A protein has these predicted regions:
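Helix-loop junctions on the cytosolic side of multi-pass membrane transporters
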Residues: 126, 130, 168, 172-201, ...
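Helix-loop boundary and gating motifs at the non-cytosolic
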Residues: 1-56, 211, 215-262
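Short, membrane-interfacial amphipathic segments enriched in basic
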Residues: 1-4, 194-206
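Juxtamembrane transmembrane-helix termini
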Residues: 37-40, 98, 102-105, 191-195, ...
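Substrate-agnostic recognition of the 12-TM MFS/MFS-like secondary transporter fold
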Residues: 9-29, 51-88, 105-164, 174, ...
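C-terminal transmembrane bundle of multi-pass solute transporters/carriers
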Residues: 50, 60, 71, 77, ...
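Juxtamembrane/transmembrane-helix boundary motifs in multi-pass membrane proteins
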Residues: 3-4, 8, 41-46, 97-101, ...
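Transmembrane alpha-helix termini and helix-breaking/packing motifs in multi-pass membrane transporters
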Residues: 32-41, 93-98, 154-174, 246-247, ...
Length: 400
């Protein structure tokens, strides 16, 4: 189940990413609560807006990032991305410490961090197959999900303690420091494949990637499901602070516990994917997981019992990670090596772009209907219906 960790370079990067991801999830918890504190009754809209401005650069720049990842040393791209994100975290810590923080500053720095991720993400995703090889790629993707979701468990717990004991500054400051570990891991990578210099223009290479995806029925389906899953599913996590305050009348400690349950489920889901990756019919499993996640999200929206809500979040976290880990694996496995950076970047535009658009749309709907649970209920029903449609009609994906 951990065979990919036998590769030195992947092991170093995995450990560095785990430490950095813990810091990132600390910041996610603190930043969501910061926005609720700054914006009061408008918090649902601003949480959606923050998600939008943080992820919008994915729509704008990730395709370019994918082309660059097929032309340049991916380590250098990742290094620059991590340094920029570290600077953003430390700037937020400083602004909160001095009392100068305003909502527009949070939104601006979220956009800058998103720009860095638009170039670092394709570099990271296209580097992984070169570190472990095709045979161990599904296991590497699953392990990457495990480290990310271990951080989803550990990060909110540490954030809850840090917020209660030291305040928000500690969460942002510790996240800034955590980037040093992944930076050190990148610098320690040895004998890494560097793409050959391209003789064609960036625009032509981008067109090649788009053309390949457009003519691949399975890649089109994977890309569409990545977008739909993020658009309809991720508002569940975005609105947890609102549900904490408006439905359960609880504080940040309760919100942190909910995030921890979702993260624990996500780790369970990632471990499951590490086993599933050895089997065929990944596409069929993906559709079943998406349909199940939509159902659980609807049940969570109806729950008014803290214990039941926590249990449903655990299940939802597992199903969400299993779904997205399988879409990521399929995107990487279906892409030829020379086009992987571009193909993965197109998938990332869909997946990462679906999150801000979904957060913004769902946030606006909450302001219209006055109920975050009602919007989540609708999202769950629609997601389940779409997944079942793909499962019944096929479209080739269920046989992959």
């Amino acid at each position: 189940m951990t065979v990919a960790l036998t590769h030195r370079n992947f092991r170093l990067l995995w450990l560095g990413a785990l430490t950095s991801s813990i810091g990132t999830w600390m910041q996610k918890v603190a930043q969501a609560w910061l926005i609720v504190t700054l914006t009061g009754s408008s918090s649902a809209f601003y949480l959606g807006l923050d998600s939008f401005v943080g992820e919008a650069p994915i729509l704008l720049f990730t395709l370019i990032g994918g082309v660059v990842a097929d032309r340049r040393d991916r380590r250098h791209m990742m290094l620059t991305s991590q340094i920029v994100q570290m600077a953003v975290a430390l700037m937020l810590a400083g602004l909160i410490f001095t009392g100068a923080i305003r909502i527009w500053m949070v939104l601006t720095l979220s956009f800058i961090s998103g720009c860095a991720q638009a170039f670092g993400g394709p570099a990271y995703q296209s580097l992984i197959p070169t570190l472990v090889g095709k045979e161990h790629l599904p296991n590497a993707v699953a392990l990457n999900s495990i480290q990310f979701n271990l951080a989803r468990v550990i990060g909110p717990i540490v954030a809850g303690v840090a917020l209660a004991s030291f305040g928000m500054v500690a969460c942002f400051g510790l996240n800034g420091i955590s980037f040093l570990f992944v930076i050190a891991a990148i610098l320690a990578l040895r004998d890494v494949h560097v793409p050959a210099a391209a003789s064609v223009s960036i625009v032509d290479q981008m067109k090649d990637g788009l053309r390949y995806v457009r003519h691949s029925r399975n890649l089109m389906a994977v890309t569409a499901l990545g977008f739909i899953g993020a658009f309809l599913g991720l508002p569940l996590l975005t609105f947890l602070p609102v549900i904490t305050k408006d439905v359960f009348q609880q504080d940040v400690a309760f919100y942190s516990r909910l995030m921890t349950f979702a993260g624990a489920g996500a780790v369970t889901g990632a471990l499951t994917v590490a086993y599933i990756g050895k089997h065929r019919h990944i596409g069929r499993m993906l559709l079943i997981f998406l349909a199940s996640f939509g159902t659980i999200m609807g049940l969570f929206a109806m729950s008014r019992t803290p214990a039941l809500s926590a249990a449903l979040l655990f299940i939802a976290g597992a199903l969400l990670v299993m779904s997205f880990a399988l879409t990521t694996s399929l995107a990487q496995l279906l892409a030829p090596g020379e086009l992987r950076g571009r193909v993965v970047s197109i998938y990332m535009v869909a997946f990462r772009g679906g999150s801000p658009l979904g957060g913004l749309a769902s946030g606006w709907l909450v302001t219209q209907v006055g109920s975050a649970p009602a919007v989540l209920m609708v999202n769950g029903v629609v997601l389940t219906s779409i997944a079942l449609f793909f499962l019944v009609r096929g479209h080739g994906l269920k046989d992959v």
